[in-house]
């Protein structure tokens, strides 16, 4: 859970694992029951996500999760002896080739050599732009470019039918040279870990927030619904970024003013805060820490009639 639930919601509940970091939200850790564990952002083992189906051996391979590094920025894996070298080489080779051919990475590399910084915008896969929203963001980016000309924009806009997203296609848009629009990002980690990335603008989604947090990237949130407003509050409370005053509206003045502050006026302050919280994410334990908690709890409790769904006599 990103939004830490109340203990005792289920008769089987003995603990809660929160993907948040202690003190990240507006409540002190002591406000929570002692059965709540803050482990920070969690990610799937990176090696399992890299290769295409064609690059995986046809025979089944059992991977050892205990020996894997679950860090979002470190890639190591070990497998049983029979497939160890072969599978790891396949995965690393596929990942290296994919990065070499990734046009987004090539563009970001070039931006870095030209001393440019990048703002990454991703409002989520289920977000549909109205024409007004789209034009307002363009207007905000135009103002930003005049104020902070060294910032380029990588804007991810999902493809949707025009009857639900009535905006120009990439070909129709005729965007200025400082904006690169993509309908899909091949590898989000490549973007978030790239040294040219200066900030991430998003809708307050759990993935967008956690991924940027784990990579130490300053954030700007234009929250859109339900829990995204809470995440906007987390971002401002922790000092890692800013939250649009007019959310969920895309007000050009509001957006451009916040982005100028985030990317220029107070950039070092936000950057240092984001890097500090990145270290706290590592310290919280992440996926490996969550695994340890789950395994220890499983070893500590007896299942009634060997049924894990049975109520625990000593549940919260």
Can you annotate each of these PLM segments?
Residues 237, 241-242, 247-248, 252, ...:
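Conserved donor-nucleotide binding/catalytic region of nucleotide-linked donor-dependent transferases
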Residues 152-158:
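Short internal beta-strands
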Residues 1-150, 162-177, 272, 276-279, ...:
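Nucleotide-sugar-dependent glycosyltransferase catalytic domains
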Residues 176-184:
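Active-site donor-binding acidic/aromatic loop of nucleotide-activated sugar
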Residues 43-44, 224-227, 247-249:
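Short, acidic/turn-prone active-site loops that include or flank metal/cofactor-
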Residues 155, 220-222, 242-244:
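Short hydrophobic alpha-helical runs that function as membrane-insertion/retention elements
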Residues 184-235:
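A donor-sugar binding/catalytic signature common to diverse glycosyltransferases
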């Amino acid at each position: 859970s990103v939004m830490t639930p109340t203990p005792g919601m289920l008769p089987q509940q003995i603990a809660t694992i929160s993907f948040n970091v202690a003190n990240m939200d507006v409540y002190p850790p002591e406000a929570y029951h002692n059965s709540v564990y803050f482990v920070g952002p969690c990610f799937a083992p990176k090696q399992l996500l890299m290769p295409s189906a064609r690059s995986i051996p046809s025979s089944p391979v059992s991977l050892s999760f205990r020996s894997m590094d679950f860090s979002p920025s470190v890639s190591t894996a070990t497998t049983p002896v029979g497939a160890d070298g072969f599978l790891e080489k396949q995965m690393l080779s596929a990942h290296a080739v994919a990065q070499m051919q990734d046009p987004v990475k090539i563009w970001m590399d070039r931006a870095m050599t030209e001393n440019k910084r990048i703002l990454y915008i991703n409002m989520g896969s289920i977000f549909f732009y109205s024409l007004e929203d789209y034009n307002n963001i363009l207007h905000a980016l135009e103002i930003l470019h005049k104020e902070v000309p060294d910032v380029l924009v990588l804007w991810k806009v999902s493809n949707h039918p025009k009857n639900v997203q009535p905006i120009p296609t990439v070909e129709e848009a005729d965007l200025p040279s400082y904006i690169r629009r993509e309908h899909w990002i091949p590898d989000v980690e490549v973007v978030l870990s790239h040294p040219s990335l200066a900030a991430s603008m998003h809708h307050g989604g759990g993935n967008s927030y956690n991924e940027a947090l784990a990579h130490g990237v300053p954030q700007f949130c234009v929250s859109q619904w339900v829990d995204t407003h809470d995440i906007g509050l987390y971002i401002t409370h922790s000092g890692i970024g800013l939250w649009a005053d007019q959310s969920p509206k895309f007000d050009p003045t509001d957006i451009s003013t916040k982005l100028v502050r985030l990317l220029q006026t107070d950039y070092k302050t936000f950057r240092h805060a984001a890097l500090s919280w990145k270290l706290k994410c590592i310290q919280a334990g992440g996926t490996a820490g969550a695994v340890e908690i789950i395994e220890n709890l499983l070893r500590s409790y007896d299942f009634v009639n060997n049924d894990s769904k049975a109520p625990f006599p000593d549940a919260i």
